[in-house]
């Protein structure tokens, strides 16, 4: 076998980062990203893009930490390069605050972010309803810039982007030797996974250029995340809700909650409503599988189900998916071991 043809299904941050990793690290292959929706119309485009991990119950914490560290290191390199503005990656400092002292005062990711420490009493005075807080510097990844940047990287490596709705992974055989499934919620239909479901997130994007520090309620529902062009105000976490239309009443509630944390937001302007459906699953599905139909076989690498935490671990999980793709290629080139895939 000479050139290996690889299809990546899905063009959110998981799909594009996986395609970019494969293009960068796997010699002798062609990569085609296939999706019915590309930026700016993906769920990832609604994401605030803050690197603060969301614990995934069925994914081992050491694995989550490794993915987060690899992602943080990857974006840190971009943030200190000439590419930072084009990629939409920058450092941001702020506070995560709690109404009661959390069971885990020092989270598993504390030594990955920069300058993690307990907030001082003077800092907490700014938030009178809160009794405990954490201060740190992390990274923000503006998906409106980062996704197009990843697309350019993929095309620059000879990859292709194809707008097409896939109804069945077998459609891609025999044109492609390996399929990487990064279809997020689409995996419910595409591979019949009943464990993946939507968690609806509604946010506001507002102009408030004077807001420089992030503020996040420890419960994760209310947050103020300043970015390069706008501040993201959140949010909601509505399990099983497929509605992509903004709810005006929810928007008012979100704005009110965020103004309680940062009263200067009352002066925010050019406010837009955004809705995304997070691909939630008890644990990320990152594994290889060989589909069999009659005498035909199709190697598949699954990489989906990151829920609210996709941005925070995208590069780490893309690296792991790439390692699995390499294993599939090795197997394809040694047919006698196909049954061991």
Swiss-Prot record:
Consequence the record notes for mutating residue 308 to Y: Decreases catalytic activity and FAD binding
Keyword check for Oxidoreductase: yes
Effect of pH on activity: Optimum pH is 8.3-11.
Residue positions binding FAD: 36-37, 43-44, 50, 307, 311-312
Induction: Expression is not affected by chronic treatment with olanzapine or haloperidol.
Thermoactivity: Optimum temperature is 45 degrees Celsius.
Entry comment describing in which tissues the protein is expressed: Expressed in the small intestine (at protein level). Expressed in the ependymal cell layer of the telencephalic ventricles, hippocampus, thalamus, cerebellum, midbrain region, pons, olfactory bulbs, and cortex. Repressed in the testis.
Keyword field: Cytoplasm, FAD, Flavoprotein, Oxidoreductase, Peroxisome
Class of the enzyme per the UniProt entry, highest EC level: oxidoreductase
Alphabetized Pfam families for the sequence: DAO
Record text on activity regulation: Inhibited by the benzodiazepine olanzapine; chronic systemic administration of the benzodiazepine increases levels of D-aspartate and L-glutamate in the prefrontal cortex. Efficiently inhibited by 5-aminonicotinic acid (5-AN) and 1,4-Dihydropyrido[2,3-b]pyrazine-2,3-dione (DPPD). Inhibited by aminooxyacetic acid, thiolactomycin, anthranilic acid, malonate, meso-tartrate and L-tartrate. Benzoate has no effect on activity.
Outcome of substituting residue 308 to G/A: Increases catalytic activity and FAD binding
Phenotype on disruption: Knockout mice exhibit deficits in sensorimotor gating, motor coordination, a decline in fast glutamatergic transmission and a decay of hippocampal long-term potentiation; the effect on sensorimotor gating is enhanced following administration of the psychoactive drug phencyclidine (PCP). They also exhibit dysfunctional melanocortin-dependent behaviors, including diminished autogrooming, diminished sexual behavior, a failure to ejaculate, and an increase in body-weight. Knockout animals exhibit a reduced occurrence of psychotomimetic behaviors following administration of phencyclidine.
GO molecular function, one term: FAD binding
Chain ranges for the short sequence motif Microbody targeting signal as given in the UniProt record: 339-341
UniProt effect for mutating residue 216 to A/E/M: Abolishes catalytic activity
Cofactors required: FAD
Reactions accelerated catalytically: D-glutamate + O2 + H2O = H2O2 + 2-oxoglutarate + NH4(+)
Main location: other
Subcellular location: Peroxisome matrix; Cytoplasm, Cytosol
GO biological process: aspartate metabolic process; D-amino acid catabolic process; grooming behavior; hormone metabolic process; insemination; nervous system process; regulation of cell communication
Subunit details: Dimer or tetramer. Interacts with PEX5; the interaction is direct and required for localization of DDO to the peroxisome.
Record's function text: Selectively catalyzes the oxidative deamination of acidic amino acids. Suppresses the level of D-aspartate in the brain, an amino acid that can act as an agonist for glutamate receptors. Protects the organism from the toxicity of D-amino acids. May also function in the intestine.
Record's protein name: D-aspartate oxidase
Species of provenance: Mus musculus (Mouse)
Organism phylogeny: Eukaryota, Metazoa, Chordata, Craniata, Vertebrata
Gene name linked to the record: Ddo
């Amino acid at each position: 076998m000479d050139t290996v043809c690889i299809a990546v299904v899905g063009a959110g941050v998981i799909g594009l980062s996986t395609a970019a990793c494969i293009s960068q690290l796997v010699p002798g292959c062609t990569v085609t990203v296939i999706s019915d929706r590309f930026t700016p119309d993906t769920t990832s485009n609604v994401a605030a893009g803050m690197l603060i991990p969301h614990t995934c119950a069925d994914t081992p914490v050491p694995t989550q930490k490794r993915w987060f560290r690899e992602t943080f290191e990857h974006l840190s390199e971009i943030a200190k390069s000439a590419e930072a503005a084009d990629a939409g990656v920058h450092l941001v400092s702020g506070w995560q605050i709690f109404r009661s002292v959390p069971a885990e005062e020092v989270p598993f990711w504390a030594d990955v972010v920069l300058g993690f420490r307990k907030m001082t009493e003077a800092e907490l005075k700014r938030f009178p309803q809160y009794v405990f807080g954490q201060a740190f510097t992390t990274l923000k990844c503006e998906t409106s810039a980062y996704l197009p940047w990843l697309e350019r990287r993929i095309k620059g490596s000879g990859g292709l982007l194809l707008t097409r709705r896939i109804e069945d992974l077998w459609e891609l055989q025999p044109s492609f030797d390996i399929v990487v499934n990064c279809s997020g919620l689409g995996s419910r239909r595409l591979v019949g996974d009943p464990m993946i479901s939507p968690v609806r997130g509604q946010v506001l994007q507002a102009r408030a250029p004077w807001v420089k520090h992030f503020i996040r309620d420890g419960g994760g529902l209310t947050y103020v995340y300043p970015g390069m062009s706008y501040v993201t105000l959140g949010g909601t976490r509505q399990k099983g809700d497929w509605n992509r239309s903004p709810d005006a009443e929810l928007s008012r509630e979100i704005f009110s909650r965020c103004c309680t944390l940062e009263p200067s937001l009352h002066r925010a302007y050019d406010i837009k409503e955004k809705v995304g459906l997070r691909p939630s699953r008890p644990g990320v599905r990152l594994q290889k599988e060989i589909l069999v139909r009659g005498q035909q076989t199709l190697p598949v690498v699954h990489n989906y189900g990151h829920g609210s935490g996709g941005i925070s671990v995208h590069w780490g999980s893309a690296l792991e998916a790439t390692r699995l793709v390499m294993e599939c290629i090795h197997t394809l080139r040694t047919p006698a071991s196909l049954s061991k895939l």
